[in-house]
Structures are given as structure tokens and as C-alpha cells.
């Protein structure tokens, strides 16, 4: 649709960014000639100069077209190595989440390599942003009126392991709490097996840290968790939830689940439903499994067809 708009002159520039741009950069250039630039997962800090370059070229081409044959349009491919760490955004951030809330990305990439996930292959290994850069970015956001910081990464709880040799999220949180103007700090994407007593203690101590955790567990049954390449089991998940609610009684827990993973049986699905009922999560996101090209799970036996993914819902409607 955007390519059609470009053909009709409704767009001055068409730029494709993100994970799919990183993965299919060559195909995009070949199959969608209207695209002016492809910017990968580590090239986003260059989007403004690239846009300036493209618009300047477009303006020059329009002038040339009036007097001579226009030159062939250039194509910008900005997909640096996925193992590079993008430059600090402290002085370049544009907040698009409203005036009082902003995301603070504390790391790039992931080392977990769950069998269903393509992220490590298009975002690279786990790289923590330097703590001082994050604190500077947070200060700039606070100066701009931001009151709530939402910490994100593919996995927030191992922040610092790659560059400091330790889980430094508790330390980062403590320092963020010292920034004047920041009133709330929310933590997303905490892997269950990486949540430490130190992190729980900091959450209890610091009043600015919301009693809220997003903990993606993906499934409850040990056989499926193992096939997924997850590093925890049902008993450990139950123990963690009980511990969090004991230590922080008013904590709000959110999680995500995948249904229809290759090899999942009806019994395992029902066991997961029972698990969710017993755990009483406050927020829940449920997604049907989707085979991702290039992942181990996509090659597994027992792929479940779309018509079967919703069998239980259909049965409920008939009842």
C-alpha cells in the first residue's frame, strides 16, 4: 500500500525499518523498488540523516527532471552488524508515548535462543547499554516532563551480565530512583529464572518502583517448556509466583502464553488452563504458535494446524 502511495506521489520517501527489514533487506530492495532505504535493528540512530539525504536527492531529481533525463534513484542500505551496540540516544530521543511516560531500552539482543524465536538471529547477542548512558537518557527524559519510565529489553533481568559480569538491574533501578522528576518505574520482560532476591528487595525498598512485573512464562507444562528451550519448569514457576506475592503482597503480575506449540496435546493445553486459573495472574496475553522460518521449532514434528488451535473456543461456543 505504501509503495502504491509512493508511485502516486503521495509519499516523498519510503523507508522500511525493524526486524523484518534486517532479515529481508535484499528481498525488499529487489521486490519493492519504491523503497528508498532499509534500516536494520542496529541502524535506527541514523534514520534522521538518511531521511535528510533521501529528501535532498528527491528535490534535486525534481529540478533535474525539468531540464534533463533524471538519474537513477539511489538506495540506502543501513543494516550494520547485529552485534554492534547502537549509539546513545540521550540527546536524540523523541517521546511518542505521550507527555508523561517513556520507554527506556536497557539492552539489545538476546542469548536465550528459545526454539520458537528468531530474535537472536536478527538482533544479535545480548548487549547492555552502559549504565551512565541510560542514566543520562533518563535525566533528559525527566527534564522533558516524563514522570514514568518503562524499562524494556528482550530480557531485562540479566542486564549488566555482559559488560559488568553481574546482574546489575537492581543497581540501575536504585540509581534511576535518584533522578528528580521520575516518579514511577515499571519493569517489563523479566525471565522467571533470572528474578533474584536482590531485585525483589529493591522493588520492596524503592517507592518509585511500581509493584508490577511482566514475566513471560510461555507455557506451564515441563514437556512443552523443554521443547521450547525454556530454562524453568512448572514447580519453579509456582514457587516464584508464591514468593513474589508473599514478599510484595500488592504486586501485579502479567504473563504471556503460547498455545498450539508443536507436539502440544489436549491434556497439556487443559493443564495450562488449570495452571492459569490457579495462579490468578492479573494480566494475561495468549498467542497461537506461529512457525518462524529458520527456528528449531518450525522444523519440529507435531505442527498443529490453525483449525485445531481454536478447537476449545469452538467447543465452548457450541455448548
Task: Indicate residue ranges for each PLM-predicted region.
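Short acidic, glycine/proline-enriched helix-loop-strand junctions
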Residues: 301-306
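Anionic-ligand binding region
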Residues: 298
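Conserved SAM/AdoMet-binding glycine-rich loop
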Residues: 14, 23, 143-266
Amino acid at each position: 500500500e505504501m509503495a502504491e502511495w509512493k508511485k502516486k506521489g503521495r509519499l516523498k520517501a519510503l523507508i522500511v525499518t525493524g526486524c523484518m527489514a534486517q532479515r529481508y533487506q535484499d528481498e525488499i530492495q529487489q521486490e519493492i523498488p519504491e523503497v528508498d532505504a532499509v534500516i536494520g535493528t542496529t541502524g535506527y540512530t541514523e534514520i534522521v540523516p538518511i531521511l535528510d539525504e533521501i529528501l535532498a536527492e528527491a528535490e534535486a531529481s525534481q529540478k533535474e527532471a525539468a531540464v534533463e533525463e533524471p538519474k537513477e534513484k539511489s538506495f540506502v542500505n543501513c543494516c550494520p552488524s547485529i552485534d554492534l551496540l547502537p549509539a546513545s540516544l540521550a540527546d536524540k530521543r523523541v517521546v511518542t508515548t505521550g507527555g508523561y511516560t517513556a520507554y527506556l531500552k536497557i539492552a539489545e539482543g538476546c542469548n536465550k535462543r528459545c526454539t520458537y524465536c528468531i530474535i537472536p538471529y536478527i538482533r544479535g547477542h545480548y548487549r547492555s547499554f552502559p549504565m551512565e548512558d541510560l542514566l543520562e537518557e533518563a535525566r533528559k527524559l525527566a527534564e522533558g516532563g516524563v514522570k514514568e519510565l518503562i524499562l524494556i529489553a528482550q530480557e531485562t533481568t540479566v542486564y549488566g551480565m555482559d559488560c559488568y559480569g553481574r546482574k546489575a538491574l537492581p543497581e540501575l533501578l536504585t540509581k534511576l530512583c535518584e533522578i528528580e522528576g521520575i516518579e514511577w518505574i515499571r519493569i517489563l520482560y523479566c525471565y522467571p529464572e533470572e528474578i533474584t532476591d536482590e531485585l525483589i528487595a529493591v522493588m520492596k525498598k524503592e517507592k518509585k518502583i511500581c509493584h508490577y512485573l511482566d514475566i513471560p512464562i510461555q507455557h506451564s507444562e515441563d514437556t512443552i517448556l523443554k521443547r521450547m528451550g525454556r530454562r524453568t519448569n512448572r514447580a519453579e514457576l509456582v514457587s516464584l509466583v508464591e514468593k513474589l506475592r508473599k514478599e510484595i503482597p500488592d504486586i501485579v503480575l502479567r504473563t504471556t502464553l503460547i498455545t498450539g506449540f508443536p507436539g502440544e496435546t489436549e491434556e497439556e493445553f487443559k493443564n495450562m488452563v488449570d495452571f492459569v486459573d490457579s495462579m490468578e495472574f492479573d494480566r494475561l496475553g495468549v498467542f497461537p504458535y506461529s512457525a518462524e522460518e529458520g527456528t528449531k521449532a518450525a522444523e519440529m514434528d507435531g505442527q498443529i494446524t490453525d483449525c485445531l488451535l481454536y478447537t476449545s473456543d469452538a467447543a465452548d461456543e457450541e455448548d
